[in-house]
Structure formats: C-alpha cells, structure tokens
Amino acid sequence: LLVYLIIKEKGKESIWILIIIGLVVGCCDMGSVHLFKNTFQRLRPCHFFDDVRLVTEKCGGQYGFISSHASNVFGLAIIVGKIMNRQILFVVLFIWATVVAYSRVYLGVHYPLDILGGMLWGTFVALIIFSLYKKYKI
C-alpha cells in the first residue's frame, strides 16, 4: 500500500525513493546489530529473568539493546513522512511504529530502554539520510 502511494505520487522519482527507504531500513538494521547489540551485549529480559512469560515461544537473539524492530519502523516512518511531506501519512506511520515498538516490550523480548534506543537510532539514521537526499536531490 505504501509502495503504491509512493509510485502514484512521485512517479519516476519513486524508484530512488524506494532505494532510499531500503537504505534507511538497512542502515537501521545493520547499525542496531553491529553498533549496539554486539557492543553492549545486554541480554534480553527473556534470557535474563527466568520468570518472564513469553507470549510466543521465541525469545529472539541473545542481545536486545537496541531494538531492531523499533529502529527499522521508526526509520521507515520518519523517512517516508519527510519525503512524502504529508502530515496525516506521517501521523499514521508514527502511530504504527509506536505500536510495533510497544509490542516488543509486551512480548517480553525487550526492555523499554531498548525501544527508546531503537526509536532514537532509527530517527537519527532517517534524518541523516533525508538531509543527504535533500542536499543532492536525486
């Protein structure tokens, strides 16, 4: 649905926008693992506490700081919101990203600080890449 909206509104420019979105999500994901999780090595609550009850049977990887889900969805929401420049779209994407991020705590696989870190990292990456996009206007 989002891809359709981008193609419909941006036409020929949409291929570059989709590449930029992929770059943001890729940088958010790789950075959350290689810059944060492997550096801080903070165990997820489901690996640290024996009495954490998981909604699903999977706990995820060993380390949880920062949440890759949170960084990816916030990076996506910010970059799409900035490029498309539509307030209602940004609000909808921001609410969606917040629900996804909250679900990680609800599922018992992240601490709230993991989510906050992911939100900040995703926002940072998206804003840096957006500033480069605006500067070089692909």
Model-predicted segments: where are they?
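Interfacial segments of alpha-helical transmembrane regions
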Residues: V3-G31
